[in-house]
Amino acid sequence: MPGVSARRLSHEERRQLAVNLTRVVTLYRSILDAYIIEFFTDNLWGTLPCSWQEALDGLNPPQLATLLLGMPREGEVARYRSVWPLTLLALKSTAYALAFTRTPGFQTPSEFLENPSQSSRLTAPFRKHVRPKKQHEIRRLGELVKKLSDLTGCTQVVDVGSGQGHLSRFMSLGLGLMVKSIEGDQRLVERAQRLDQELLQTLEKEEKRNPKVVQTGPRHPPHHVVRWVDPTTLCEELLLPLETSPQSRARLLLTGLHACGDLSVALLKHFCCCPEVVALASVGCCYMKLSDPGGYPLSQWVAGLPGYELPYRLREGACHALEEYAERLQKAGPSLRTHCYRAALETVIRCAQPELRRPGVQGIPRVHELKIEEYVQRGLQRVGLDPHLPLNVAALRAHQAQENRVVAFFSLALLLAPLVETLILLDRLLYLQEQGFHAELLPIFSPELSPRNLVLVATKGPLGEAFSLLETEDN
């Protein structure tokens, strides 16, 4: 999907982008704020302009992927069956033009061509116990952190919200960085320490089997700390150096791989207020968990704009997987009917118990193999209602016949979702610049593998042309 590069924008252009984003989000708030499971109960299709309904009605999933989301299959040419209204074309063009580009600036052969489960860019010891998505993420972010550390003269990397320690382990034992790993869950830390020891033993065995491999110095596994990082207070542990040197002060680089909600905000605030922290590389996620207020907006500029507010539903939608859904649309698989079935179930729930709105429904296996009435019966049971309630099967079948409309409305919301994510991340960029620091956003992961793929990079001093090194991929 095309978009705008944050790197190519001046400070004033970034501020103007925030103005444009708040205007557009306000204009299409009714779509962004809608819950797809209320498609029938709230007549969401009827909220669209009639001309939009005519243009979108009857489009099959692959056509939606190509014409609306702008993601045709390779070699496919977009062919419109009718002239779309200018307002719908404007929505599409605006969504493309104002969202940060999610395509990395480098193009390399897929690391999973030979084996979909094993990255060809990571050695076997670092792939063990690591899912393909995470293999891709730790390699890309780890290599960027290594370059950023070298450019800024950092003496220590602090990985916040480190989980099982996969990123910390790669940075320390794979890239030779001094790493402190901070995680609030004791069980995850204990598992990380076990994996550290397992990897160390594997590397030692490899050295014995292959004497030509020369280890240049002692290996330093990550130093693990069990600690919750409170976004509202300074975490002293985060700032303590691993090694004290009387000659120089510690220079810290903070990083977080998909630091959840306010944890990403905590990294920004520690970077801003602590002189020991000279660099930051943060990939955020779970925007709906941001404190309101406190987590957004951070910048004075965005806070002063009319329409800046992003309620829970909009922030939840910003955690989109646009590329993955477009691929599902192109395949037109039966799993696409899940939203339609769930929306039909909501109509039955409201009739049976009107005060019960949007209850969570535990996963119903193999939905696409069920008749809609069978799905509704299982869904009723999962929300604590009588599964043998009399059902209007004709009404349910009429809902099922609108499956493509449900998919079309969801696709519209998904088209707009990157604008909300862009506004959240742009607010963080502007916040850092308001504090007098240098900040950029880079697409670092393949969006098909990792939807939250934009890394916020910040430094206390300018990097100049050297910053371009962070956009390249190691051979």
UniProtKB/Swiss-Prot annotation:
Coiled-coil spans in chain: 186-210
Keyword Coiled coil listed: yes
Major location category of this protein: membrane
Entry-linked Pfam families: Methyltransf_32
Chain segments annotated as transmembrane: 406-426
GO cellular component, one term: membrane
Domain of life: Eukaryota
Swiss-Prot/TrEMBL keywords: Coiled coil, Membrane, Transmembrane, Transmembrane helix
SUPFAM superfamilies documented for this protein: S-adenosyl-L-methionine-dependent methyltransferases
Membrane topology (UniProt): Single-pass membrane protein
Annotated localization: Membrane
GO MF terms, alphabetically ordered: rRNA (adenine-N6,N6-)-dimethyltransferase activity
Keyword Transmembrane helix attributed: yes
InterPro entries: Methyltranfer_dom, METTL25, rRNA_Ade_Mease_Trfase_CS, SAM-dependent_MTases_sf
Similarity comment: Belongs to the METTL25 family.
Protein name, per record: Methyltransferase-like protein 25B
UniProt source species: Bos taurus (Bovine)
Source organism phylogeny: Eukaryota, Metazoa, Chordata, Craniata, Vertebrata
Gene name of this polypeptide: METTL25B
